[in-house]
Amino acid sequence: MSENIPDIDPNELLPNAPGQHQDLGVDNPPEPDNASIRAERGSPTPSSVTVDNAPSLPDRSFSHLPINDPFSGEIPEVPIPSSAISISSQALSDPVPTPSDTSRPGILRNDEQGSTSSHPVDPQEPNEVNNEYLAHLLDLGFDEYTAVLALKRTNSAGVEQAVAWIVERSNESDFDEDSSSSENEADEEMGAVQSVAGRTHKMVLVANMSLKMGTGKIAAQVGHATLGVYRQAMNSENGQNAIAAWTRHGQVKIVVKGQSTEQLMDLCKVAKDAGCYYYLVQDAGYTQIPAGSRTVLGIFGTVEQVDSVTGGLKLL
């Protein structure tokens, strides 16, 4: 038995399918109109500006503006006060200060020092020494450095004052006519002298660091100072007793730093006033330093005496 199958039109099954000769442009729809979309949403439509409808800007050039010449007319004269005229004339009449007057602020000229009483000039140490006094000191055998230093410290008061200043700060043996008069006393044995019980002694040697001596040079000068102090102490009975006590307690020796030749000479006087034995070495000048330089000061005595002189100095 055969069934009758009805004929089916393909176009009825696919009504939206495009035909064979249908325009394919419908598959690519055009871009949506943004203006219509903004109108639906309530958004304002931006206005387009072209070259033709652009608004004209104001002309900002100043070429058409007139410029007045400030120097075209007459300049008005400004009256000058009479006080200014008097000041200018006085300034022209005053002398111009010389460089020597203005190079050192606060220092008045010689003619102004006597007339100015409200602001007196402080006394200053003279920079130059009296050449006549210096020549006398050199004739007496003092070296130039010591002579100049003595004249400065005594304000060039005179030769006697300078000599006294040097003597107070030097070895007594430097001015003795016969420095070997105590050689027989030095031959005595130290063990034969009884020391004072309970006394502790020490020796301090002050090196002059301003001379820039080497290590070996300082060691040699310290040896000279130690021997010099020892000889000075052995010249008296009290010194021999002190040396004996010092020997029994280990012969304490301490080397400290001195700042300058002037400090060593001042310490020499302080040691003399304190009752210590002292010796200031003057180098012969064969190596490193000039002849006559004060290199090392040796001080010997009781602990209390020596500490009162060199207690503030630092160890070398």
Swiss-Prot record:
Catalytic activity: an N-acyl-L-alpha-aminoacyl-tRNA + H2O = an N-acyl-L-amino acid + a tRNA + H(+)
Presence of the UniProt keyword Hydrolase in the record: yes
Keyword tRNA processing: no
Record field: compositional bias (Low complexity): 75-89
Pfam family, one: PTH2
GO cellular component, one term: cytosol
GO molecular function: peptidyl-tRNA hydrolase activity
Domain UBA: 128-169
Listed Polar residues bias regions: 44-53
Chain spans, region Disordered: 1-127, 170-193
Keyword annotations: Hydrolase
EC code: 3.1.1.29
Enzyme class: hydrolase
PROSITE patterns, per the entry: UBA
Composition bias, Acidic residues: 173-190
Recorded family membership: Belongs to the PTH2 family.
NCBIfam families with a match to the protein in the record: arch_pth2
Role this protein plays: The natural substrate for this enzyme may be peptidyl-tRNAs which drop off the ribosome during protein synthesis.
Name used for this protein in its record: Probable peptidyl-tRNA hydrolase 2
Native organism: Caenorhabditis elegans
